[in-house]
C-alpha cells in the first residue's frame, strides 16, 4: 500500500505539471471503474474517509453531505431542513408513504401535502438516483444502496469497527473523554440504524444487506481502501 501511495503521489505531481485532473490521471493509470460505490458505516469507523480515498483513486466524485445540497437545490427545500433531518429516524409509516408518493413527483398534490420529513427523504432519494445516472461516484450513507438497488452498477460496502477502537478515534478527533465519545457513537449509530431500517426492507449493518463488509479496526484504514479498489477492479 505504501508503494501504491508513492506511485499515486508521483502521478499527481505529474498531473499538476500538465494541469490534469484526478480523473485524467485515473484514466492514464487505468484506475477506472463503472461502479457507483455506496458506503454505509458505523460512526467512528472511518467509512467516510475510506470512501473519499477510493473516489480519489478512481478519479470520481464522492458525495457525503453534498447529497443534501443537491437534494435541496433540486427540490427547492432549504438545505438547513435537510441537515436537521439528516439520517434521523421518523416513524414506521414513512417507507410506504414515501414509496407510494415517489412515482408522482414534486409537483403533485400528494407531495405538497406530505409532512416535511417525508419530502426530505423523497427529495434525497431522487437526488441519489440523478447523481448515479451521471456516472461512477462514491455515495456515503443516506440509504444510497437501497435507492440504487435496481442499478446494476451499484456496489455496496459497509464499514464497521470494534467499539473501543471507535471510542479512541472519536475521542482524539473531537477532544472528548471516553464516556463522551461512547455516548456520541451510541447515539449516532442508533439514529443511523433506525433511519436505515425504517426506509428499507433490509437491516443496517447486516452482511446480507451489502456486497462487501469491512472491519477497519482489524484490517486498518489503508487495507480497507485497497480491498474496495481490488474488488472493483474485478468487476471491470
Where are the regions that the model predicts?
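RNA pseudouridine synthases
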Residues: 131-134, 143-154, 169
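Conserved phosphate-donor/acceptor-positioning beta-strand/loop module used by diverse small-molecule
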Residues: 150-173, 178-186
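Short beta-strand-centered segment that lines the nucleotide-binding/catalytic pocket of NTP-utilizing
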Residues: 60-73
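Extreme N-terminal, non-catalytic leader segments
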Residues: 1-34
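Glycine-rich phosphate-binding P-loop
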Residues: 38-55
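Pre-Walker A (Motif I) flank of P-loop NTPase domains
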Residues: 32-40, 135
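ATP-dependent small-molecule kinase phosphotransfer cores
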Residues: 72-136
Amino acid at each position: 500500500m505504501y508503494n501504491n501511495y508513492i506511485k499515486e503521489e508521483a502521478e499527481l505531481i505529474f498531473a499538476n505539471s500538465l494541469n490534469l485532473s484526478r480523473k485524467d490521471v485515473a484514466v492514464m493509470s487505468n484506475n477506472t471503474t463503472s461502479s457507483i460505490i455506496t458506503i454505509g458505516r458505523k460512526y467512528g469507523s472511518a467509512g467516510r474517509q475510506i470512501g473519499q480515498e477510493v473516489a480519489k483513486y478512481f478519479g470520481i466524485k464522492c458525495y457525503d453531505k453534498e447529497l443534501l445540497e443537491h437534494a435541496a437545490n433540486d427540490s427547492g427545500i432549504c438545505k438547513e431542513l435537510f441537515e436537521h433531518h439528516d439520517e434521523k429516524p421518523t416513524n414506521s409509516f414513512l417507507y410506504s408513504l414515501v414509496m407510494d408518493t415517489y412515482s408522482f413527483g414534486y409537483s403533485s398534490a400528494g407531495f405538497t401535502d406530505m409532512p416535511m420529513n417525508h419530502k426530505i427523504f423523497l427529495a434525497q432519494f431522487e437526488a441519489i438516483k440523478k447523481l448515479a445516472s451521471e456516472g461512477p461516484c462514491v455515495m456515503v450513507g443516506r440509504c444510497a444502496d437501497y435507492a440504487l438497488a435496481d442499478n446494476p452498477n451499484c456496489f455496496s460496502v459497509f464499514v464497521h469497527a470494534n467499539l473501543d477502537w471507535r471510542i479512541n478515534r472519536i475521542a482524539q478527533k473531537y477532544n472528548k473523554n471516553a464516556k463522551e465519545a461512547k455516548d456520541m457513537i451510541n447515539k449516532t449509530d442508533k439514529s443511523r440504524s433506525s433511519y436505515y431500517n425504517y426506509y428499507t426492507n433490509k437491516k443496517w449493518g447486516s452482511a446480507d444487506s451489502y456486497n462487501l463488509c469491512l472491519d477497519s479496526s482489524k484490517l486498518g484504514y489503508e487495507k480497507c481502501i485497497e480491498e474496495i479498489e481490488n474488488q472493483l477492479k474485478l468487476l471491470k
